[in-house]
């Protein structure tokens, strides 16, 4: 018996809570859950439905479905027993059996599911035992929370005390100003204020400086935002540090955030961050094979440009390991042409497909940088060789434009981190996405809708998205930009071995291949 997932979904197939007990991608579980309502017939009394690959064991709970997805070899009686246990647990943690109630208690339900099912197998537990396990408390956690709360309270008390002292100093200064003694006692009050502020530990660091600077005590008082201080409006008494610049900067950042921009704080990198660097390669020799795509596809079909540019680069850590030759092989692809580095023996490469230096006594360069040795291009490829095809179908209906986009991926590549960027007309609100296979994000500043698919493999070679925007010209949604990567290449070039030019065993090596997009558009 193997339970693949335990889920709570709506009648329409919307996933509210789902706990997977085996390694399963999000796209696959969403597809299985979305397909379930179509398989359930009306008026039938069965509690399970079978497909070609999985079995659904389900129970309606008011307007929702409690669902187990299992493999077809599982014991249906044990599955039903597990389902009964979960059906008793759900009301214990979600008294309101509707979408909102289930979503609010999602984590509690997942924890309960974990206590009832372990690695796809039912645990021999009761409802009371599950509740007891989930409610177990940690003494260390309680002590830590009490300690943190104590520190928060202590800090709050110190802040209140300092605020009270500042208010008293302000009142004292106001009385002195009215009595005509401000010229005598003013600087002393300011000096005392700086001494008190240094106690808080915040100071005036980060490049602001205090040399030759006096400060108006109104800037320390608590005021409503946007109300200028007396020092900001009164011309030069020589007493005031104007804080208007910081306020304007904050307002500008807030306006950018309101437009959807992601604002990163401008901070100096810490010593810890400055020490972080990419991990060095573990093998003495590393071969990197990379192909870049430059593709322009017509929206009505056909290809304007399809260009593949590849590079074989070598990284050698030690000089002693640089006296080597690389034996390579590749697929016989039409239109494939190679170009070698001037220091590479071209005759040896053309006759035996061996990458070696012209001078055998001269090693390959060593260090942390990669050295490109061979480049190639592939010309004359047609639309049937595209790794990913995208079609866009905008249609205006009344006061709305319905846009349907679909993708089809070739069998020869598994694509990673796919992002399809669709330009949109200027909108006041985000578009209404009706259906999507994957995730979406709206960049309001650039007016671009980004459709993201983490992985395209055999389980999802095709997919679609539908969204609605106000009336717009169909050409507004072009050009569509596409980005992705793959771990295989068109040429399928690889290193099959390393020949040492000096006595001894060949050094250990590793190789990595990747296909990336330089410019991939539908126009």
Curated annotation (Swiss-Prot):
It is a peripheral membrane protein. It is found in: Cytoplasm; Golgi apparatus membrane; Cytoplasmic vesicle, COPI-coated vesicle membrane. InterPro entries: AP2_Mu_C_sf (IPR036168), Coatomer_dsu (IPR027059), Longin-like_dom_sf (IPR011012), MHD (IPR028565). It comes from the Eukaryota. Residues 282-523 form the MHD domain. Residues 218-243 are annotated as: Disordered. GO terms for cellular component: COPI vesicle coat; Golgi membrane. Keywords: Cytoplasm, Cytoplasmic vesicle, ER-Golgi transport, Golgi apparatus, Membrane, Protein transport, Transport. Its main location: cytoplasm. Pfam families: Adap_comp_sub (PF00928). Oligomeric complex that consists of at least the alpha, beta, beta', gamma, delta, epsilon and zeta subunits. The coatomer is a cytosolic protein complex that binds to dilysine motifs and reversibly associates with Golgi non-clathrin-coated vesicles, which further mediate biosynthetic protein transport from the ER, via the Golgi up to the trans Golgi network. Coatomer complex is required for budding from Golgi membranes, and is essential for the retrograde Golgi-to-ER transport of dilysine-tagged proteins. Belongs to the adaptor complexes medium subunit family. Delta-COP subfamily. This is Coatomer subunit delta-2. It comes from Oryza sativa subsp. japonica (Rice).
């Amino acid at each position: 018996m193997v339970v693949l997932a335990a889920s709570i979904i709506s009648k329409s197939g919307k996933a509210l809570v789902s706990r997977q007990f085996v390694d399963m991608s999000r796209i696959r579980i969403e597809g299985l859950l979305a397909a379930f309502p179509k398989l359930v017939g009306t008026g039938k009394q069965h509690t399970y439905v079978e497909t070609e690959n999985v079995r659904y064991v389900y129970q309606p709970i008011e307007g929702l479905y409690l669902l187990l997805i299992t493999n077809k070899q599982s014991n249906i009686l044990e599955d039903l027993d597990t389902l009964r246990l979960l059906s008793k647990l759900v009301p214990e943690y979600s008294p309101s059996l509707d979408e909102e109630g289930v979503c609010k208690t999602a984590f509690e339900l997942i924890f309960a599911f974990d206590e009832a099912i372990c690695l796809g197998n039912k645990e021999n537990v009761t409802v009371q035992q599950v509740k007891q396990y989930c409610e177990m408390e940690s003494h260390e956690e309680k002590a830590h929370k009490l300690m943190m709360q104590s520190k928060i309270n202590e800090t709050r008390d110190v802040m209140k005390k300092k605020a009270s002292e500042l208010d008293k100093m302000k009142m004292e200064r106001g009385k002195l100003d009215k009595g005509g003694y401000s010229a005598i006692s003013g600087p002393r009050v300011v000096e005392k204020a700086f001494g008190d502020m240094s106690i808080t530990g915040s100071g005036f660091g980060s490049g602001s400086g205090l040399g030759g600077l006096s400060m108006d005590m109104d800037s320390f008082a608590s005021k409503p935002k946007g109300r200028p201080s007396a020092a900001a409006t009164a011309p030069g008494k020589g007493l005031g540090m104007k804080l208007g610049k910081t306020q304007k900067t904050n307002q500008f950042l807030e306006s950018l955030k309101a437009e959807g921009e992601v604002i990163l704080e401008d901070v100096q990198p810490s010593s810890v961050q400055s020490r972080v660097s990419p991990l060095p390669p573990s093998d003495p020799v590393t071969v990197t094979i990379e192909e870049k795509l430059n593709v322009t596809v017509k929206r009505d079909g056909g290809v304007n440009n399809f260009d593949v540019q590849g590079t074989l680069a070598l990284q050698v850590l030690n000089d002693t390991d640089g006296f080597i030759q690389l034996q390579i092989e590749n697929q016989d692809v039409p239109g494939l042409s190679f170009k070698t580095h001037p220091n590479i023996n071209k005759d040896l490469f053309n006759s035996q497909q061996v990458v070696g230096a012209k001078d055998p006594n001269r090693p390959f360069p060593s260090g942390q940088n990669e050295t490109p040795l061979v480049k190639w291009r592939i010309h004359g490829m047609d639309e049937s060789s595209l790794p990913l095809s995208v079609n866009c179908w905008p249609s205006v209906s009344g006061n709305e434009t319905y846009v349907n986009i679909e993708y089809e991926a070739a069998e020869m590549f598994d694509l990673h981190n796919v992002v399809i960027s669709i330009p949109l007309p200027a909108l006041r609100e985000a578009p209404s996405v009706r259906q999507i296979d994957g995730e979406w994000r709206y960049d309001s500043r650039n007016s671009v809708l980004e459709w993201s698919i983490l992985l395209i493999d055999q389980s999802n070679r095709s997919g679609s998205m539908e969204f609605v925007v106000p009336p717009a010209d169909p050409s507004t949604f072009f050009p569509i930009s596409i980005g992705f990567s793959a771990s295989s290449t068109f040429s399928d070039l690889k290193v099959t071995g390393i020949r040492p030019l000096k006595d001894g065993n060949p050094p250990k090596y590793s190789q990595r291949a990747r296909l990336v997009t330089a410019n991939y558009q539908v126009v």
